[in-house]
Structure formats: structure tokens, C-alpha cells
A protein has these predicted regions:
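Glycosyltransferase specificity loop/lid
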Residues: 1-95
């Protein structure tokens, strides 16, 4: 199963997901973690593949950038897991 994991760049949101991503991989899933460029090392800890987008100081711009990046690759995935502040995740998953 191909899983797209979408998160925003906040340590308190990302670090708790590392174990979940590792478990998904252990169960045979191929996980791609979508995060801003600069977070490659954190994603590498989970063993997921990294997909990047441009970071921004404003949350609204982070969400727009994450959505634009996800929209480019979403069709490759069977499942999308997204964090609570990425409210466009539901719309993305319904496409």
C-alpha cells in the first residue's frame, strides 16, 4: 500500500508521528512523507521517502504550498494521512 503522510513544520506535530510511520513501513507500506524542504533529516529517521515543498512563516501559506505539492503526486497513493491543521487534506483525499 502506498501512503502519503502530510504534515506541517512543527516539531510537536511531526515527532509524535515518526513511530506511526515506522510501524506502517514495518507492516509493508511504502510511505512518502510530505514536509517542507529542510526537514529531510527528521523524515529520514522514520525511513519514509521524502517529498518536499517550500516552507513559509505564515500557516496559510504553508497549507497552500503543501496542498500544491500534494496535488502533484496524490494519484500515486492508496491512502493519505494528514495532520489536523491541514484542513485541505479531506478535499485532497476525495479527489
Amino acid at each position: 500500500m502506498q501512503v502519503l503522510f502530510i504534515n506541517l513544520p512543527y516539531y510537536g506535530h511531526v515527532v509524535p508521528t515518526i513511530g506511526l510511520v515506522q510501524e506502517l513501513i514495518a507492516q509493508g507500506c511504502e510511505v512518502t512523507y510530505l514536509m517542507p524542504f529542510g526537514w529531510e533529516d527528521i523524515v529520514a529517521e522514520s525511513k519514509a521517502q521524502f517529498a518536499g515543498y517550500q516552507n513559509h512563516k505564515q500557516l496559510s501559506e504553508q497549507i497552500k504550498n503543501a496542498y500544491a505539492a500534494a496535488e502533484q503526486i496524490v494519484e500515486r497513493f492508496d491512502m493519505i494521512i494528514y495532520e489536523q491543521f491541514f484542513f485541505l487534506g479531506k478535499h485532497l483525499a476525495e479527489q
